[in-house]
Design a protein with these regions (language model features):
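Short beta-strands within extracellular/lumenal beta-sheet-rich domains
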Residues: 494-511
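Exoplasmic/lumenal beta-rich domain surfaces
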Residues: 397, 541-550
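Extended, low-complexity, turn-rich repeat/linker tracts enriched in Gly/Pro/Ser/Thr and Asp/Glu
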Residues: 510-513, 523-531
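Surface-exposed, flexible coil segments in extracellular/virion-facing regions
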Residues: 384-408
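Extracellular glycan-recognition surfaces and repeat-rich motifs
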Residues: 444-498, 550
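Primarily auto-inhibitory N-terminal propeptides
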Residues: 22-110
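A short beta-strand segment in extracellular, disulfide-stabilized domains
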Residues: 366-379
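Extracellular (secreted or membrane-anchored) zinc-dependent metallopeptidases
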Residues: 70-72, 78-88, 93-138, 148-354
């Protein structure tokens, strides 16, 4: 009789994830993110206000002097970091290049819908001479397409955890970083609620060179003209534009202004495209630019359903941000940086190899002796013309030259799997570790573990995917019903979304079907907003897949 062998894994995941009303769409949470940062860093607000004062003065000076060289162009190197777990969020390079083309059209006043913009805003919409180009050299001088595809759990992006940027963004004084994710989870409650499209930080919010000087954007909003313009909107914030209805993420509530002369004060619009010619009670008086009652509904920095334009003063403000020392935006378009980032590069790159199990987001794998794992290619950075899979321990590879293959592991022990991908430019190899388990139960009958002996018990495992200081650890500083030993996690050290595992030996339940599994638990919630979770899971395939059992 074949026995089903189970291993129980106990994981405590610490997170602070609010409930979001999915039926609504929140185009932007830039000001929410900024306010959260100001609360966390008492010096940030002072730094930001000083930067804004500098930019305000520089904008006025540039507007008065109108000294911009004829036919001058601000070229900004861009890199997209696509974070994914193998799903639809792993958008294609073609989708990104199409979105970038639309952004450049918006900033060049080159859209096919320009003639439909209401006056006087059609005439106020000018070519910004700002162009965004994919970088072709990374910070180390290596060839890049300017689009990274990174298999990363941070694709479910926690806005509250500003450490998420670490290891993703490239030097923001040399690149505009756009991080594409599957979902943005805001901290606390955001006015308007709903699905978050994107956010960034205006110049001066973070210190120069900070990894957080980037745009975070939902992958689902790059699939149509007006959705793409939401990214043009976020770039506008990154270039120091405010919402036309003021420094808030909640339009339609109160009259607001962006402090620019040629954009009428407005309550703002959400999800509709009202009249630009009348009905704006916030613009009670005529000016030399617009008449009383007018509003620029079609402004890209509004929340309307018909974004089409920037104004002349908005364009001047964005040019000023790029010419300023604030966050060293002036370095982005310098000749030295354009050479270093190789924005005009055309040479193809060798691909960068990457692969994962088709049904797992783990970077290390466990399988029963004689079992198999299906691996899937997630390489990027170049067109791939060849695949070559290899594995140790006498493993059998079903399709060694395909992008997806099943590999069977006949012998217990540690081994490796490697994928080499290549094209005419070069090749690259990725190696991952696999542990093949001898599926012999470590627990064959009734047992008890009180953790009274020093160290992790024989056959048990502590798994800390984040490799940080917050992990399952032993303590003897508690009074339990059967002694003083226990395993615990110091929750104050856990980052949002962190998961840690405590794994038992293999338990033979096939011959012990009348047995039960129980454990003693002590837990206290630090605050009502914390959503810590304890889950008990079991696996029938030596850790290949897991199902919740309690």
């Amino acid at each position: 009789m074949k026995k089903h062998l189970y291993s129980i894994i106990v994981g405590l995941g610490l997170s602070s994830v609010p409930v979001i009303a999915q039926q609504a769409v929140q185009p932007c949470i830039t000001y929410h993110a900024m306010e959260e940062h100001f609360k966390a860093d008492t010096q940030a607000k002072t730094r930001y206000e000083a930067a804004q004062k500098q930019l305000e003065q520089e904008t006025i000076q540039n507007s008065m002097s109108n000294a911009r060289p004829v036919a001058f162009q601000y070229t900004v190197p861009v890199v997209f970091h696509v974070l994914h777990q193998g799903g639809a969020e792993n958008i294609s390079d073609a989708t990104i290049t199409a979105a970038l083309a639309q952004i450049n059209s918006d900033y060049a006043r080159a859209g096919s819908d320009v003639t439909s913009i209401a006056q006087p805003f059609q005439n106020l919409y000018i070519n910004s001479d700002i162009k965004f180009m994919l970088a072709h050299k990374d910070p180390n001088g290596n060839c890049t397409t300017g689009i990274e595809h990174l298999y990363d759990t941070r694709t479910v992006w926690q806005q509250a955890n500003t450490s998420y940027y670490n290891g993703i963004t490239w030097n923001p004084t040399k690149y505009l970083n756009v991080i594409i994710v599957s979902q943005i989870v805001p901290s606390g409650t955001v006015a308007g609620g709903g699905t978050i499209v994107g956010y960034t930080y205006k110049p001066g919010t973070w210190s120069t060179g900070a990894s957080q000087d980037a745009i975070v954007y939902n992958f689902g909003y790059l699939n149509s003209l007006y959705n793409m313009r939401s990214l043009s909107h976020e770039i506008g914030h990154w270039l120091n534009l405010s919402h036309t209805f003021g420094n808030t993420n909640n339009p339609g509530v109160a009259c607001g202004d962006d402090q620019l002369y040629d954009t009428p004060p407005t309550k703002g619009n959400y999800g509709s495209c009202g009249s630009s010619s009348s009905g704006n009670s916030c613009a009670a008086s005529s000016t030399s630019v617009y008449t009383a009652g007018q509003q620029n509904v079609e402004n890209i920095m509004d929340y309307s359903s018909c974004p089409k334009n920037f104004t002349t003063d908005q364009t001047n403000a964005m040019r000023t941000a790029l010419a300023s020392s604030v966050n060293n935006r002036q370095n982005l378009w310098s000749a030295t940086n354009l050479t270093a980032t190789d924005v005009n590069g055309t040479s193809p790159c060798a691909p960068i190899a990457d692969f994962y199990a088709a049904n797992s987001a783990l970077t290390s794998y466990t399988v029963c002796e004689g079992g198999s794992i299906t691996f899937k290619d997630f390489s990027y950075n170049g067109t791939i013309s060849s695949y070559n899979w290899s594995a140790g321990g006498g493993a059998n590879i079903a399709s060694p030259s395909a992008s997806v293959t099943s590999i069977t592991f006949p012998t217990a022990g540690a081994t490796t799997v490697a994928l080499t991908v290549g094209n005419s430019t070069g090749s690259n190899t990725k190696v991952r570790n696999v542990y093949v388990m001898n599926a012999v139960p470590g627990i064959t009958g009734p047992t008890n573990e009180s953790f009274e002996n020093q160290g992790v018990p024989s056959g048990w495992s502590v798994i800390n995917p984040n490799s940080n200081s917050a992990a399952w650890d032993q303590t003897f500083d508690v009074v339990c019903y059967d002694g003083f030993g226990a395993f615990f996690i110091e929750g104050s050290k856990c980052a949002t979304g962190q998961i840690d595992y405590l794994e038992t030996p293999i338990i033979d339940v096939a011959n012990n079907q009348d047995q039960s599994f129980s454990f003693a638990l002590s837990y206290a919630q630090k605050s009502s907003t914390q959503n810590d979770v304890l889950k008990v899971q079991g696996s029938k395939d030596c850790g290949g897949t897991w199902n919740e059992i309690a």
